[in-house]
Structures are given as C-alpha cells and as structure tokens.
Amino acid sequence: GWASKIAQTLGKMAKVGLQELIQPK
C-alpha cells in the first residue's frame, strides 16, 4: 500500500542522510 511505499522512501532518505553525515563526500 501507499503507507509501506512512503515508509520505504523515508527509510532510503534516512539511510542516505546518515551515510552523508558519517562520510561527507
């Protein structure tokens, strides 16, 4: 459903954000 899709998108964004915080390009 749309809820799981939103959760997936937020999870991806959070993962990317954390990686950028830990290892800034």
UniProtKB/Swiss-Prot annotation:
**One GO cellular component, as annotated:** extracellular region
Keywords linked to the UniProt accession: Amphibian defense peptide, Antimicrobial, Secreted
Where does it live in the cell?
Secreted
Any one Gene Ontology biological process term?
Answer: defense response
Entry comment describing in which tissues the protein is expressed: Expressed by the skin glands.
Q: What does this protein do?
A: Antimicrobial peptide.
Similarity comment text for this entry: Belongs to the gastrin/cholecystokinin family. Magainin subfamily.
What is the name of the protein in this document? Xenoposin precursor fragment BM3
Which species expresses this protein natively? Xenopus boumbaensis (Mawa clawed frog)
